[in-house]
Structures are given as structure tokens and as C-alpha cells.
């Protein structure tokens, strides 16, 4: 068990704690995500496929993008298949109501989060959180002053409906008086129905104000004593909505709840109930449910409660929470009640159809009719007064409507259209949210466009086409009609006449009430067909309309039966799912109890096993000691036997190994002998092959030698021929040289003789000059001695200067030519020898034929460098440059140095003059 848990009790607590953490994690994280994903999937399959799942928040650019709404492939099962959407707001409201019906389970789960005892909040999905926020906004405190007649209270209900929130609309005394007057006027025109019909009543609930008509009608002063009369409009269920539906649904119904001020219209207006036009024309075709009950009267005190009701863990509350069985039963009852009414009122309906079609042709306006459709609509002149968007209160089947409930009539109609009031939503939006199970309904007459005669006839034909299209699979887009009403261009004259006619209907006239004005169009052709009269045509048309209406009734009955069957199937599925949920929870509880019992039993068994194990361990230890001693003896004996057997086995293995080694040695020797013989044979074969190759090589070398010898002899012959020619040339050159030397020698001898003769002449001339000079000096001395006192300058010109030419220079001997010196060594003061004009002649062996022969001989008989120079040792630069003196590091030369020397064969021009003497 571990050191932290000393006993089984702590382990149980630890297990409970871990289990609670796991369950909390599942409830607060995993199940929340799964519910949110399920809601988004349901919305995707019930709305359109173009919208992204909003599991994560969008970016602002995605959030503000407006996309065109498209009809989903998956249609609502409660929707009438041939009903067409006449306005965008109607479709939006129907989607909101269907979403409320689908997400009721999520809201009821949200209602169990917070209790009055301050229980811990659970994490919920974003849709449920939005619904909770909207519900809190509904329950926000508002000051109950006479200026604000709208406030929210909680309806006192029984145990089954205690989780629902009820918005209450309060009206003033003047509004109540006007409503009572209107009720009395309506009751004088036609009797009010005393029975409550929840399904059609919910359709007109937003357009009525609460007026008590039972016991309190006789005593209006009692009710006037109260300052405010709070009338319950309907129970408002907080449904989780997506961000689109939230802005249109709960927010509008909660924050913009208003009561339109009732202004009594003129008495002579055609829309007023007691006008003669209404009595004579519209009274026969007014619907029976012109005044509909919407709920019971409640207290005028407003009680503020928490928007989230406390949760109850009992199975009965769980059954009410997770199912819509009671609501679906009420829907089935309403449908059966409507079918019974239709069968009873078919004659009156056919008469009304005739009057309705005749008045439409006569007035070019729509007149309300009652043809047994899914809902009873108020007349066109009735305007919605209450702006709330109620829903049908959930009936659990245990409580029924009391017979003495107060009936609420329609408010006095306002002559202004409903679209002019900004606080009142459209009637299509109100009716779409009244009944969640019946699907979308027809909009009221005030929300429709005025239909012409041609459009009314074309719609009857379109209904037949829509019956055929009902069995086809749904498409992503509703096909547009061939000629929609918004694109019909009416003639100007007819349109102006219609406007004037409507103005005359809406304003009081001075004509007496018994007189009716004729508004029949005068644009028909004057020529009439004599074959059939107008009465016959009208009769045939009405007969066709009657047949079409009967077919429509049959089709609607089929639709109702299919709808009831589908609702029964949904109810059975939901009950089955609820039963499975309850069984699963019971199984979870049973598993918890069984797990606790198993853990306790396990710990008890563990303790018992521990005690038994201790006793058994002691007995086993004693038995083990005895068995160990016996075992040791057996082991020792077995060890000796095994050692003996091992020794014998080892000896046997040794013998086998020796025999095996002998066999291996023998095989190895045989293999070696075989390999030796094979190697010998191979060696002999290789030797023979080598000898053959050697013989071939020698033969080839011999042939090559003969070829070389022949080439050598040929070359020697050529060389001998060249040598002979060179010898002849040499001899001729020697002869020429001897002749030149002889000529030079003769020339030298002649020159020497001439020089000797010149020397003799010069010697004789010098002797003569010396004698003459001596004679002159003697004469001068004698003359000076004779005239010592006389100072006379005497210019004496020597006859030697003009007597003969100047003595020429002696002949220089030619330089001695050393035949062994070729001028290859230069002295330090010699200039570079010119290659084109060498200073010394090139020897004969270094030019011409001797040079070619010497090169050929050296090519074929290369000198042996090893014999000439011996072994050349590698240079050791360290040994060469081992001395180091300071002057070595100084540059003492006056030459031009370029350091470092350039790489390449080209020598720069600056280096060509670097060796010149300066």
C-alpha cells in the first residue's frame, strides 16, 4: 500500500478523492467541449453549411463579414413543406424558435448549475453562458414606476414548472379601460369563445393585452382599485442561442419590452368593429378566434428571483428536465383539436372562401379568411401591441387549463401601420416564436404585400407545383417564383386608384353608413361573350376553388398525420434516450457501491491473507530448513556423482578429441600433399611458360638488337660520311688558315722591315737635329758674350718644326688568341656578351655538322652520370647556412632588388638592369 496510507480507510479516501477529481474533470472540461461540439453540429445541420463552427472565437475580420443566408439541406421536420418564406425576418424567427426547441436540454442543464444554497458553479458551453447572461438581463431590477409599465416577475407555478422564468407586462388604468371598451364592442359583434385553444392562442399572444373578462368584468371598479395590473404574457424559456439569434431573440424580448399606447380610432372608420362596412362585408368572414386567451392573471407584486433555479437530483425532476414529452403531447392534442374543428367548419369555410375571393377581386386588398390552416390569423386591420416574443408554456401533462381562466381579447386596432413603430417588431417575428413545435407559420396580413388579382390566381397554381416538389430532396436554394411580387409593375392609373381607394377607406367620409362606394375597375373590355354569362364563369371558378380547397384540406390532413407520427417517433426516441440515461446513472451508482464493497472485501481478504501468510511462512521456513539439510546431503552426493561422471565424460571427450585430431592431421597432410603436387605441377607449368616467354623475349630482343645494330651501322655510316666531309672541310679550312697565316706572316715581315727602315731614318734625323741644336747654342753663347750691355729680344724659329712631318704612332700588336678560351667566363668589369655579335669566335665543334653529330652520339650513348659525378648527396641547407653573422641581415649590395621575386618565366624590365655596374 505504501508509506503515505497506513490503513485501508486512507486508501478508500484516496480512491474517492481521485474518482471525484476525475468526474469533475470530465464534467467541467470534456463534457463541456462535447456538448458545445454537439450544439454546433446541430446548428450546422439545421441552418446552413456556409457558416463555420464557432468553437473558437473569430477574428474581427471574420466576425464582421456578412454572408448571404442560404436554406439548409436539412429542413425542420415540423415545418409545413409548401409554406414559403415571405420575409427574411420570418425565416430568422422560425430558426430561432426551432433552435430553442432543440437546445432546451442545454438550458435545463444550465438551470441546475447554481442553487439557492450557493452550490459551486459548473463550467458550461458558450451558448449556455450566453443564454444565462440573457436570462440575467431579463431578471435585472427595474423601478416599478407608473412611467415604466413594463417589469419582470416570476409566475407562481406548480412543482413541474418551477424552473421557468416569466416576464410580466403591466398596463395602466387608461389602457385597461380602452381594452374593456374594445372587448364589449367585439362581444356585441360576435360571441367570444369560452374554451382555451393553446395552439392558435399562442399565435396571437404577442398582439393582445391582458383584459380579465370572467368575474372581474362585472366588477371593474375592484380591479381599478389596484394601481398596476400585472398580466402574464407567456412563460419565456431562456434558450441557448448562437450570437446571431441572440441579438434578435432574447435580447429584443427582454430589453425592448414595450406596451403600445392604445389610441381609439374614429368610429366611422371601416376598420372599426361597429362600422357598417365591417358588419356587412367583413363580419361573415372574420375568424372565430378573433380574441384569444394567452394566460391567467397573476399578482401585481413583482418578486425578484435568481435567473438560475436550484437543481434537484430526484429522478422525477431529471425526467422532466431531459425530455419534451409533455410538450409534444400538448402539440398532438392541439393538432387533433384543429382537425376536429376543420371537419366541423367546412361548409362555413367554403362560403367564406367565396366571399374572400370576391372581395379580393372587388377591393384589390387581402381579406382575412379561415380555411382550417395550421393557425388562425387576426384580420389585416389588427395591429400587434405587445412587443414581447413569447413562447408556448411547457405543459407537463399533469396540470390542465382551468375552466374559469380569464380570456384576453385583442387590443383596439391602431389605424397606423405596425411598421411605423420602431419599438414593435414585425408580426412575422412574433408569430415565429409563439409555437416551437408547429414550425413556421404564415405571417399576419399586415406583414404581407398587397396582392393583385393575377398574383392571387397564380399562387393557387403555385401550390400545385409545390405539392409535386414536396417529395423531391431539399435544395440549397429556394427556387424563385417566375414573377415575384416585388417586381410586378402595376399600371399607373390602377395604382393611383388603389392609393385613393385605400385613403378613402382609412378616413371618415360624409356619406351615410348604409351607402357603399363601388371600386370595381373599369378597364375590362366592353364586349362580353354571349355564350356564357358572368354568373356561369363565377360559378365555375368558385367550383374550381372549392375542389382545390378540398384537395388542399386532404393534403394538410396528410401533413398533420405525418407530423403527428413524426412527433410520436421523436417522443419515443426521447423517452428511450431518457430511460437509457437514467439506467446509466443508476448503473454508475451501483458500480460505485459495488466498487466500495469490493474494495472493503479486498482489504479484509488482504488482512486475512496476511495472517495466513505469516503462519504459513513460519511453517514453510521450518519445513524448508529440514528440506534444506536433506537437500544439501542429496546435493553433495549428486555433486560427487556428477564430478565422477564429468571426469569420465572428460576422459572420453579427450579420447575422442585425440582421435579427431589424428584424423584432422591425416586429412591435413593429405591435403598438403595434394596441394604440394598441384603447386609443383603449377610451378612446372609456370616455369615452362616463363621459359617460353623468356625465349620469345630473347628472340624479340635479338630482333630488336639486330634492328638497332642495323640502324647504328646506318647511322655510323652516315656519321662517317659526315666526318669525312667535315674532315675535308677542316683540311680545307686549315689550308686556308695556313694560307692566311702565311700571308699574315709575310705581311708582318714586310711591316717589320718597313719599321726597321723608319727607325733607322728617325735615328739619323735625331742625330742631325742634336748636332744642329748644339751648334746654335754655341753661337748664342758667343753672341751674348759679345754684346752684354745690349738688351735685345731675338725670336729664333726652330727649323725642326717645319722640316718634316710628325712621327706616327707605333703599330700595335694584335691580341693573343687562346684557342682554349672561349670567352664563357666573364671578369667583373666585362660587359655582357652579345649573342648576335660575340666578342670571341665560336669554335668549330660547337657549330654546324660537328654539333649535330655530337648531339646524336650523346642521345644514343648517354653518359653515365654516376661514374662522372659519383653519388650526389641531398643538400643540407642547415649545414650550408649554419653560420649567422649580424651583417648577413643587412643589405649591403647597391644593386636593384625586387623582393619577393616574381613567379613565372617572364623577367621584368627592371630586373634586366639589376646586374649592371653602377
Curated annotation (Swiss-Prot):
Q: What is the effect of changing residue 36 to R?
A: Loss of localization to the central spindle and midbody in anaphase or cytokinesis
Q: List all Acidic residues biased stretches.
A: 459-471
Coarsely, its chief localization is nucleus
* Tree of life domain: Eukaryota
Database matches in InterPro entries = INCENP_N, Inner_centromere_prot_ARK-bd
**Gene3D superfamilies this protein is in?**
1.20.5.3600, 6.10.250.2990
Biased region (Basic and acidic residues) positions are 432-441, 607-623, 630-640, 754-782
Q: State the family it belongs to.
A: Belongs to the INCENP family.
Q: Where is the composition biased (Polar residues)?
A: 289-316, 395-413, 421-431
Which residues in this protein are found as Phosphoserine? 72, 119, 143, 148, 197, 214, 263, 269, 275, 296, 306, 312, 314, 330, 400, 446, 476, 480, 510, 514, 828, 831, 893-894, 899, 914
PTM remark: Phosphorylation by AURKB or AURKC at its C-terminal part is important for AURKB or AURKC activation by INCENP.
Q: Which intervals carry biased composition (Low complexity)?
A: 197-208, 384-394
Q: What is the effect of changing residue 169 to E?
A: Abolishes interaction with CBX5
Name of protein = Inner centromere protein
Keyword Cell cycle on entry: yes
Q: Tell me, what's a Pfam family for it?
A: INCENP_ARK-bind
- Region SAH, as annotated, extends over 531-765
Main function: Component of the chromosomal passenger complex (CPC), a complex that acts as a key regulator of mitosis. The CPC complex has essential functions at the centromere in ensuring correct chromosome alignment and segregation and is required for chromatin-induced microtubule stabilization and spindle assembly. Acts as a scaffold regulating CPC localization and activity.
**Region (Interaction with AURKC), start-end ranges:** 822-897
Free-text domain note: The IN box mediates interaction with AURKB and AURKC.
Asked if Phosphoprotein is a keyword of the record, the answer is yes
The record describes its quaternary structure and partners as: Component of the chromosomal passenger complex (CPC) composed of at least BIRC5/survivin, CDCA8/borealin, INCENP, AURKB or AURKC; in the complex binds directly to AURKB or AURKC via the IN box, and forms a triple-helix bundle-based subcomplex with BIRC5 and CDCA8 via its N-terminus. The reported homodimerization is questioned as the SAH domain is shown to be monomeric. Interacts with H2AZ1. Interacts with CBX1 and CBX3. Interacts with tubulin beta chain. Interacts with EVI5.
Amino acid at each position: 500500500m505504501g508509506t503515505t496510507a497506513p490503513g485501508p480507510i486512507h486508501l478508500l479516501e484516496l480512491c474517492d478523492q481521485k474518482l471525484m477529481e476525475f468526474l469533475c474533470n470530465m464534467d467541467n472540461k470534456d463534457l463541456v467541449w462535447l456538448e458545445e461540439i454537439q450544439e454546433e453540429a446541430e446548428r450546422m445541420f439545421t441552418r446552413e453549411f456556409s457558416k463555420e463552427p464557432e468553437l473558437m472565437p473569430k477574428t474581427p475580420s471574420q466576425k464582421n463579414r456578412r454572408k448571404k443566408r442560404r436554406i439548409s439541406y436539412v429542413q425542420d421536420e415540423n415545418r409545413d413543406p409548401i409554406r414559403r418564406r415571405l420575409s427574411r425576418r420570418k425565416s430568422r424567427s422560425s430558426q430561432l424558435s426551432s433552435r430553442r426547441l432543440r437546445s432546451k436540454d442545454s438550458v435545463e442543464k444550465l438551470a441546475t448549475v447554481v442553487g439557492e444554497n450557493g452550490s459551486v458553479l459548473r463550467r458550461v458551453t458558450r451558448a449556455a453562458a450566453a443564454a444565462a447572461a440573457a436570462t440575467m438581463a431579463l431578471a435585472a431590477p427595474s423601478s416599478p414606476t407608473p412611467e415604466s409599465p413594463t417589469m419582470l416577475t416570476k409566475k407562481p407555478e406548480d412543482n413541474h414548472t418551477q424552473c421557468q422564468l416569466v416576464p410580466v407586462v403591466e398596463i395602466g388604468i387608461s389602457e385597461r379601460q380602452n381594452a374593456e371598451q374594445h372587448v364589449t364592442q367585439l362581444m356585441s359583434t360576435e360571441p367570444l369563445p369560452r374554451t382555451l385553444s393553446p395552439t392558435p392562442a399562442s399565435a396571437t399572444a404577442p398582439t393582445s393585452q391582458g383584459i380579465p373578462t370572467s368575474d372581474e368584468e362585472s366588477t371593474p371598479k375592484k380591479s381599478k382599485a389596484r394601481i398596476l395590473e400585472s398580466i402574464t404574457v407567456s412563460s419565456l424559456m431562456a434558450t441557448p442561442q448562437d450570437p446571431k439569434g441572440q441579438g434578435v431573440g432574447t435580447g429584443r424580448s427582454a430589453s425592448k419590452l414595450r406596451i403600445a399606447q392604445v389610441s381609439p380610432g374614429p368610429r366611422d372608420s371601416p376598420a372599426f368593429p361597429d362600422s357598417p362596412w365591417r358588419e356587412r362585408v367583413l363580419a361573415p368572414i372574420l375568424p372565430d378566434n378573433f380574441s384569444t386567451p394567452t394566460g391567467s392573471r397573476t399578482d401585481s407584486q413583482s418578486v425578484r428571483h435568481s435567473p438560475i433555479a436550484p437543481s434537484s437530483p430526484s429522478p422525477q425532476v431529471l425526467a422532466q428536465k431531459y425530455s419534451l414529452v409533455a410538450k409534444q403531447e400538448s402539440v398532438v392534442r392541439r393538432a387533433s383539436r384543429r382537425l376536429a374543428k376543420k371537419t366541423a367548419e367546412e361548409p362555413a369555410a367554403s362560403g367564406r372562401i367565396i366571399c374572400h375571393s370576391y372581395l379580393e377581386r372587388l377591393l384589390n386588398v387581402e381579406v382575412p379568411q379561415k380555411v382550417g390552416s395550421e393557425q388562425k390569423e387576426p384580420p389585416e386591420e389588427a395591429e400587434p401591441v405587445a412587443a414581447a416574443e413569447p413562447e408556448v408554456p411547457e405543459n407537463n401533462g399533469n396540470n390542465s387549463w382551468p375552466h374559469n381562466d380569464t380570456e384576453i381579447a385583442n387590443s383596439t386596432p391602431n389605424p397606423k401601420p405596425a411598421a411605423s413603430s420602431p419599438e414593435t417588431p414585425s408580426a412575422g417575428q412574433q408569430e415565429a416564436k409563439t409555437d416551437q413545435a408547429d414550425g413556421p407559420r404564415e405571417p399576419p396580413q399586415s406583414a404581407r404585400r398587397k396582392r393583385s388579382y393575377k398574383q392571387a390566381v397564380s399562387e393557387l397554381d403555385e401550390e400545385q407545383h409545390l405539392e409535386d416538389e414536396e417529395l423531391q430532396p431539399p435544395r440549397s436554394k429556394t427556387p424563385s417564383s417566375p414573377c415575384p411580387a416585388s417586381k410586378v409593375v402595376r399600371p399607373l392609373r390602377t395604382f393611383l386608384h388603389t392609393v385613393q381607394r385605400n385613403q378613402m377607406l382609412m378616413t371618415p367620409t360624409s356619406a351615410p353608413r348604409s351607402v357603399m362606394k363601388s371600386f370595381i375597375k373599369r378597364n375590362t373590355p366592353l364586349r362580353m361573350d354571349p355564350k356564357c354569362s358572368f354568373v356561369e364563369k363565377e360559378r365555375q371558378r368558385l367550383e374550381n376553388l372549392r375542389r382545390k380547397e378540398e384537395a388542399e384540406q386532404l393534403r394538410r390532413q396528410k401533413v398533420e398525420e405525418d407530423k403527428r407520427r413524426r412527433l410520436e417517433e421523436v417522443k419515443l426516441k426521447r423517452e428511450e434516450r431518457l430511460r437509457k440515461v437514467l439506467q446509466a446513472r443508476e448503473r454508475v451508482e451501483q458500480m460505485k457501491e459495488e466498487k466500495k464493497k469490493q474494495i472493503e472485501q479486498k482489504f479484509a481478504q488482504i488482512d486475512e491473507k496476511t495472517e495466513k501468510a505469516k503462519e504459513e511462512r513460519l511453517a514453510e521456513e521450518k519445513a524448508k530448513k529440514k528440506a534444506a539439510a536433506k537437500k544439501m546431503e542429496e546435493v553433495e552426493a549428486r555433486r560427487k556423482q556428477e564430478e565422477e561422471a564429468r571426469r569420465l565424460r572428460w576422459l572420453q571427450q579427450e579420447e575422442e578429441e585425440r582421435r579427431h585430431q589424428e584424423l584432422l592431421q591425416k586429412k591435413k597432410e593429405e591435403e598438403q600433399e595434394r596441394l604440394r603436387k598441384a603447386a609443383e605441377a603449377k610451378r612446372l607449368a609456370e616455369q615452362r611458360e616463363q621459359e617460353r616467354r623468356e625465349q620469345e623475349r630473347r628472340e624479340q630482343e635479338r630482333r630488336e638488337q639486330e634492328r638497332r645494330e642495323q640502324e647504328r651501322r646506318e647511322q655510323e655510316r652516315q656519321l662517317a660520311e659526315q666526318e669525312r666531309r667535315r674532315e675535308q672541310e677542316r683540311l680545307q679550312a686549315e689550308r686556308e688558315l695556313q694560307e692566311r697565316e702565311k700571308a699574315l706572316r709575310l705581311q708582318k715581315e714586310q711591316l717589320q722591315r718597313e719599321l726597321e727602315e723608319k727607325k733607322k731614318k728617325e735615328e739619323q734625323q735625331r742625330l742631325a737635329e742634336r748636332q744642329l741644336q748644339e751648334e746654335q747654342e754655341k753661337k748664342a753663347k758667343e753672341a751674348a758674350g759679345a754684346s752684354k750691355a745690349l738688351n735685345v729680344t731675338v725670336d729664333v724659329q726652330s727649323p725642326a718644326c717645319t722640316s718634316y712631318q710628325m712621327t706616327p704612332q707605333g703599330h700595335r700588336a694584335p691580341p693573343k688568341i687562346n684557342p682554349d678560351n672561349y670567352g664563357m667566363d666573364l671578369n667583373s668589369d666585362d660587359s655582357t656578351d652579345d649573342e648576335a655579335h660575340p666578342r670571341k669566335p665560336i669554335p668549330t665543334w660547337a657549330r654546324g655538322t660537328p654539333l649535330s653529330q655530337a648531339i646524336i652520339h650523346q642521345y644514343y650513348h648517354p653518359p653515365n652520370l654516376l661514374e662522372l659525378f659519383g653519388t650526389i648527396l641531398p643538400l643540407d641547407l642547415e649545414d650550408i647556412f649554419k653560420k649567422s653573422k649580424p651583417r648577413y641581415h643587412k643589405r649591403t649590395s647597391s644593386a636593384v632588388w625586387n623582393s619577393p621575386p616574381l613567379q613565372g618565366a617572364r623577367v621584368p624590365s627592371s630586373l634586366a638592369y639589376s646586374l649592371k655596374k653602377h
